[in-house]
Amino acid sequence: MQRQEQLKKWLAQQYPGDEIQLEFAAADADFRRYFRAIWPDGASRIVMDAPPEHIGTDAYIKVRDIFSMVKVPEIYLRDREQGFIVMEDLGKVTYLAALQHDERALVHRHLLLEALDTLVEIQKGSQPDVLPEYDEALLSRELSLFPEWFCAKELGKPLNFKQRQLWDAGVKALLPALLAQSKVFVHRDFIVRNLMLTPGAPGVLDFQDAVYGPVSYDAVSLLRDAFIEWEEEFVLDLAIRYWEKARAAGLPVPEAFDDFYRAFEWMGVQRH
């Protein structure tokens, strides 16, 4: 509550005399929160609260500028010391909501192809030494969430010795396959909850943890999304479409689709 009052005071200083209604919009898994600031005429902007002692705004601004070739929120105001940003409001309709509202395969295919076009645009700008490396340590850390968080904490059933041996053997087999993939910019959470339904192309959110890593990662995140499921034939068709688009754009995907899809499936094991 103290942070919210601090935020309201800051907004009043930035927009003196304006009657602004502030409503909660969303929160990330970390300390970052978002509010929707609404003016009497109906205009709105999104306000980010990112406490500088925990997370700050630097990573968000850096990746936002790197991904500016696609539809990311325009930044209007920033207070680095307090951890506040006022940015463009891309609306309330996520891809997930749109896909759940209209379940026709034709609609899903159209929206997902638009998302894949956006992904290819992001990847076309890839270059090394710009974003953190998605290396073995980071991949291993993500994989460790399954035994350490999901099994032990969420389910209350930590792996026994034999199960842990099997898990470790699986990880040992998986990591080389993932690390062998060519690298591009990776959004790292390119899922339907982080894409907004906006005219022409999806708005892209929650990109601040982007890295430089495996080329199939974001396509897998989108097409193997944990919050929505499609028939295997549908996913295969879209994976082919992505591979074709990536090849046409000169991205470092395998020349043979079979090789790409094998890498895609390996990445799916790590991702979900």
List each model region and its residues.
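ATP-binding glycine-rich phosphate-binding loop
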Residues: 20-35
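ATP-binding pocket architecture of kinase catalytic cores
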Residues: 35-139, 145, 151-156, 179-180
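Protein kinase-like catalytic core scaffold
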Residues: 46, 71, 85, 184, ...
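Short, contiguous acidic/charged loop-to-helix segments that flank catalytic cores in large enzymes
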Residues: 51-54, 209-210, 225-233
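Active-site activation/catalytic loop segments of kinase-like enzymes and analogous catalytic loops
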Residues: 145-154, 215-252, 268-272
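Juxta-kinase regulatory segment immediately upstream of eukaryotic protein kinase catalytic domains
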Residues: 1-20
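Active-site acidic catalytic loop and adjacent metal/ATP-binding pocket
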Residues: 31-38, 171-217, 229
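Helix-rich C-terminal or lid/interface subdomains of diverse kinases
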Residues: 110-113, 137-172, 177-182, 248-272
